[in-house]
A protein has these predicted regions:
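Beta-solenoid repeat scaffold
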Residues: 1, 239-241
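Sequence-level preference for short, compositionally simple segments enriched
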Residues: 1-224
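N-terminal amphipathic/hydrophobic targeting modules at extreme N-termini
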Residues: 230, 235-239
């Protein structure tokens, strides 16, 4: 397990510029599992790829600026702020799919279309807000395949409800009336929202970086919900994380 928390900015460790040109550069690469970045600012624009290579990675309360091919496709992004200076911040997400929870997207370029991915891959966006300076179309990817299914809930653009990928609506699953939402988002008896990062990141070793397992279990026991997705749906949503309280009782 590796955690990066409030990574300090030490100017004395900086290097003098070789010239005035701007080069793309990765913030960091890693080969490992169970990575957490909390309250870290990642600024590198093109090809940033913060902590790219992690099997499971949580970005919590992080700030990112990016152009294209710049975000980590295996990440769970919770309470993050992302500024898009390019139209396609992801190169790919098909290794497992990226998830955004309660995050803000600021479209900072002048184009009239914003996508998440350059390639075709799964994404989930829950309780997220787009902030735009002019009308912008937001889509999952530039040329989505017919088989692609991405998931959204509670998405807004400048405060108004918004459906991502309206050009091909069959690519988008709106989870407002779906049990699958509990794989990402739960509400306790007091109305408090619990983002199910335990379910998304637990893997085979019960990893729970934000210590929400007990809350997830209590919610499952309180209202008797044991969410099972039928086999036919699971086959079509093979990357979908499942919320199953019975496995943690």
């Amino acid at each position: 397990v590796m955690s990066i928390w409030k990574f300090p900015l030490k100017k004395e460790l900086g290097r003098k510029k070789r010239n005035v040109c701007h080069y793309p550069g990765a913030c960091s690469y890693c080969h490992g599992d169970k990575i957490v970045a909390e309250n870290v600012r990642f600024i590198s624009r093109l090809n940033m790829n913060p902590l790219n290579g992690a099997k499971r990675i949580l970005f919590y309360k992080c700030y990112m600026e990016s152009t294209d091919d710049a975000l980590t496709g295996t990440g769970v992004y919770l309470n993050c702020t992302l500024k898009f200076y390019g139209q396609k911040p992801f190169w790919r997400t098909d290794m497992g799919g990226a998830v955004f929870l309660n995050s803000d997207f600021y479209v900072c370029h002048d184009e009239d279309r914003q996508y998440f991915c350059k390639g075709v891959g799964p994404l989930t966006v829950v309780d997220c807000q787009f902030h735009v300076r002019k009308p912008v179309y937001a889509g999952w990817t530039h040329e989505p395949s017919d088989w692609l299914r991405c998931y959204q809930y509670g998405v807004t653009m400048n405060g108004q409800p918004y459906v991502i990928g309206a050009d091909k609506p069959y690519n988008t699953v709106c989870m407002e009336q779906e049990n699958v939402l509990h794989a990402y988002r739960l509400t306790d008896e007091n109305g408090k929202v619990i983002y199910n990062t335990y379910n998304l990141l637990r893997g085979d070793d019960d990893w729970d970086p934000l210590q929400v397992k007990d809350s997830v279990r209590v919610i499952g026991e309180h209202d008797g919900r044991i969410m099972r997705i039928c086999r036919s749906v699971c086959r079509s949503l093979r990357w979908l994380p499942l919320y199953r309280p019975e496995v943690i009782r």
